[in-house]
């Protein structure tokens, strides 16, 4: 149906429909599994302009939690391996995701360029600057991820995801009852940002994201749970 809407009303309308339906499905699924999502800072989500969402990444559940709470169409810079999962590939393509092969530098650069084009065209995009999922403590945010915002001039919406790994990743992908907390922080403007501020942007955003995590989950030794 989303493809039909794209043909009739344009790409943005198709993406909006796909995200709306995805949010309905995700919300119903999470309710059935007893997963509770708490949202703080919803007022920080821009209503009338597009943005780049920057978040820490604890679990595969993160994508679905974002879609279910954001109430805005959004695509993701996602790892290429997800294209091998037919259902995920179809759904993620329908909401405007861009797939990135981390093992192929040229393709990774092209994926970032494609993401920048989408943001310049008015789409919202999300990227996880750690580059992989972790079991809690954050990895260093990769500075290159922030080009999605600085090259497009879109504001950054920092997001902290807390607790999703205990619901999914720690249970061998069996969803258990629990609570995930999403904290949306105030936006950071990037248009016209001086070069010296761009150079420290990754550290600045990581500090903001980490401020809503327990101290032991901000930095430190962690287990990479993404092969």
Placement of each model-derived feature along the sequence:
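Membrane-interfacial terminal anchoring regions of lipid-handling membrane enzymes
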Residues: 1-17, 37-47, 200-227
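Catalytic core of membrane glycerolipid acyltransferases/transacylases, capturing the structured
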Residues: 2-9, 15-20, 24, 31-33, ...
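Amphipathic coiled-coil/heptad-repeat helices and related helical stalk/stem segments
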Residues: 38, 59, 84, 108-112, ...
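Generic preference for hydrophobic
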Residues: 39, 53, 76, 182-184
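Thr-Gly-centered strand-to-loop micro-motif
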Residues: 40, 77-79, 101-102, 128-129, ...
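Residue-level detector of flexible, active-site-proximal loop/helix-junction positions
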Residues: 43-44, 83, 104-106, 163, ...
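Non-catalytic C-terminal accessory region of glycerolipid acyltransferases
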Residues: 109-227
């Amino acid at each position: 149906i989303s493809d039909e809407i794209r043909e009739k009303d344009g790409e943005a309308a198709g993406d909006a429909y796909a995200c709306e339906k995805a949010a309905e499905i995700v919300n119903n699924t999470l309710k059935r599994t007893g997963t509770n999502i708490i949202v703080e800072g919803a007022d920080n989500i821009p209503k009338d302009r597009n943005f780049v969402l920057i978040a820490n990444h604890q679990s595969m559940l993160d994508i679905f939690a974002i879609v279910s709470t954001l109430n805005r169409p959004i695509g993701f810079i996602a790892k290429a391996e997800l294209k091998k999962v037919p259902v995920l590939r179809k759904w993620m393509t329908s909401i405007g995701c861009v797939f990135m092969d981390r093992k192929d530098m040229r393709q990774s650069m092209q994926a970032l360029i494609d993401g920048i084009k989408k943001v310049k065209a008015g789409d919202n995009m999300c990227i996880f600057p750690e580059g992989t999922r972790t079991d809690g403590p954050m990895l260093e945010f990769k500075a290159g991820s922030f080009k999605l915002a600085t090259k497009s001039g879109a504001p950054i919406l920092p997001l902290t995801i807390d607790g999703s790994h205990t619901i999914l990743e720690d249970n061998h992908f069996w969803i258990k009852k629990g609570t995930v907390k999403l904290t949306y922080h105030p936006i950071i403007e990037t248009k016209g940002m001086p070069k010296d501020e761009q150079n420290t942007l990754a550290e600045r955003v990581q500090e903001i994201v980490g401020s809503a995590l327990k101290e032991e989950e901000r930095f430190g030794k962690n287990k990479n749970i993404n092969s």
